[in-house]
Design a protein with these regions (language model features):
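Conserved G1/Walker A P-loop phosphate-binding module
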Residues: 1-78, 86-89
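C-terminal effector/interaction modules appended to NTPase cores
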Residues: 1-2, 19-25, 203-408
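Conserved hydrophobic helix-helix packing surfaces used for dimerization/oligomerization
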Residues: 14, 190, 299-301
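Conserved C-terminal guanine-recognition region of P-loop GTPase G domains, centered on the G4
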Residues: 52-60, 65, 75, 79-149, ...
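G-domain G4 guanine-recognition motif of GTPases
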Residues: 67, 97-102, 120-136, 149-158, ...
Length: 408
């Protein structure tokens, strides 16, 4: 995702489902007015979910997801169907495309049941009505219920109506809290600590840093970005001028050094902890970090990241966090790792789950993962809270959230 685009995690996710050759890809192309999806008469052309970002008026920035057929067959087919079902966990609006010449079958009805179970708003789109006789179209139209629409992707019939119906399903902003706008006032100074090490991307800031800067700008406050190596001299300079920063936000990995350089009277937290509140449930993840004290040898711990990136020596998820946990607990647990869209439905065998801040996941998917853990009685925490705990500054790192500090 480029720096000048809306992050994928902040876009409305619109997913198209249906059997093979129901015309999902054709409907996508008709709705978007672009050749976003490959169209073929060969059954099963879409073999993995395909993601495309675009602007779709009047919805604005959206993520269009084309999924494999829900009736795919064989061993590989079953894996593709599983991939389609996984997409549900991040779907804000579901579009079920049905071949009007065959109608809804067991697969479609089962999928509608899943929509209801997950609380996903959806439309049923009967495609290929151009292949029906006049009488057939009339009969189908008589049976159409609210939330269903007849279209022909081939000739564009009723596509505008479909777009208008999709727009009515636009989800409300469900974020309980902003990223940090409620923590600061206009003209407050916020210092962001961004270490530049070998893991930092070349020529840009990572997404959590970009989004935090944007949130500060929207509040009318001031942001100053410094490296951890210049933080102390920067603070000394401002304090000597009688200017006290309202908040310092750091990369969690730098907590140990930064906490020593930031005076106790200045509030300190991390990007990861801010995102824990913004994307998920801070209190749930705070409760989860307490599990560290009961870790034993051979306990299984899942470390999950929402993105896929090239792992280097010293990678935070696969190297640093396991080392911190081993050093803090004095135990030798077994670590397992997932990244990107992969997250197990069954986490019951894990002692705990440690998740990244989830900046690349939309809110629905992050909350799904938290719910998976909660429903199965498995504690979940996030990188920032865990690092704060092992460095001995957990209570201080929650300075912006006094109600959370009381729980420590």
């Amino acid at each position: 995702m480029g720096m000048n685009q809306t992050p994928a995690s902040e876009r409305v996710h619109i997913s198209f489902f249906g059997k093979r050759n129901a015309g999902k890809s054709s409907v996508i192309n008709a709705v978007t007015g672009q050749d976003l999806a490959i169209v073929s008469s060969v059954r099963g052309t879409t073999t993995d979910p395909v993601y495309k970002t675009m602007e779709l008026l009047p919805l604005g920035p959206v993520m269009i997801i084309d999924t494999p057929g829900i009736d795919d067959e064989g061993e590989l087919g079953a894996l593709r169907v599983r991939k389609s079902y996984q997409v549900l966990n991040k779907t804000d609006i579901a579009i079920l495309v049905v071949d009007s010449t065959t109608g809804k079958g067991e697969e479609e009805l089962a999928l509608i049941h899943r929509f209801h179970k997950k609380g996903i708003p959806y439309l049923v789109v009967y495609n290929k009505i151009d292949l029906l006789s006049g009488e057939g179209i009339k009969d189908l139209a008589m049976s159409v219920r609210p939330g269903e629409v007849l279209v022909s992707a081939a000739d564009g019939m009723n596509i505008q109506e479909l777009k208008e119906k999709i727009a009515t399903l636009k989800p409300e902003d469900t974020h309980k809290y902003p990223l940090l706008q409620d923590l600061i006032e206009p003209l407050d100074l916020v210092i962001l600590v961004v270490p530049i090490d070998k893991a930092a991307p070349k020529g840009r800031l990572i997404l959590p840093q970009q989004q935090t800067i944007r949130d500060i700008l929207e509040r009318g406050a001031l942001s100053l970005v410094v490296r951890d190596t210049e933080l102390k001299s920067t603070l000394d300079h401002f304090l000597a001028q009688g200017v006290c920063p309202k908040l310092v936000v750091t990369d969690s990995q730098a907590f140990a050094r930064v906490s020593k350089d930031v005076p106790e009277n200045i509030t300190l937290t991390s990007f990861s902890i801010l995102f824990s509140r913004y994307k998920g449930e801070l209190e749930t993840q705070l409760e989860g970090v307490a599990t560290l004290s009961s870790i034993q040898d051979d306990d299984r711990i899942l470390i999950a990241e929402g993105c896929t990136h090239h792992r280097q020596c010293g990678d935070i998820g696969t190297c640093k966090i396991p080392d911190w946990i081993r050093n803090y607990t004095g135990k030798k647990p077994v670590f397992e790792f997932t990244s990107g869209t992969e997250f197990p439905d069954d986490v019951s065998s894990y002692k705990m789950v440690v998740h990244c801040g989830g900046c690349m996941l939309n809110e629905r998917e992050m909350k799904y993962r938290i719910a998976c853990c909660r429903d199965q009685g498995v504690p979940i925490t996030n990188y920032g809270l865990l690092i704060a705990q092992v460095t001995g500054i957990l209570k201080r790192s929650l300075g912006p959230f006094p109600e959370m500090q009381k729980l420590v």
